[in-house]
Amino acid sequence: MKMPRILLPLFAAAVLAGCAHVPQTASEPSANKGQDMSYTQSVVSKYSFDETVSRLEHAVKAKGMTVFAVIDHQAAAKQSGLSMQPAKVIVFGTPKAGTPLMVKAPEFALQLPLKVLVTETGGEVKAVFNDTRQLIRGSRIGYGEVENTLTNAETLIRKTVGE
């Protein structure tokens, strides 16, 4: 009778040991995925940090879009007794462009409104934003549906700070 009692724990241990070597599936997040910034684009600004933020806000508004928020990460860090480089995220968009996309693919609401980070490191000011093709990747939205809206926002950012 002792033999069957020993076999069950050994079998369970073998199964658990086998599970430890199961490869990661596509649905599981990679430990390095959050570290991968290849989904972003950046433009070196020819303006100061504050001027870059101001120019982007004005350009967005001039195109009829709304600036929903400007998040000052440096100020938030300072309030917590921490220090960091200047970094502001401008959150912007227009329901006219975003709503049809969210109706077609409700989960796309996680990608909107659009955002642009302005940061300064080593004396260099950059505008960093998500690549449009990567934003729509894996969604039911085709590039043709955003090339005259989301892609135009990329062009606006580039022209506003880089030209």
Locate each region found by the language model.
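Bacterial N-terminal signal peptides that target proteins for export
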Residues: 1-8
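C-terminal partner/receptor-binding element of secreted or periplasmic proteins
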Residues: 133-163
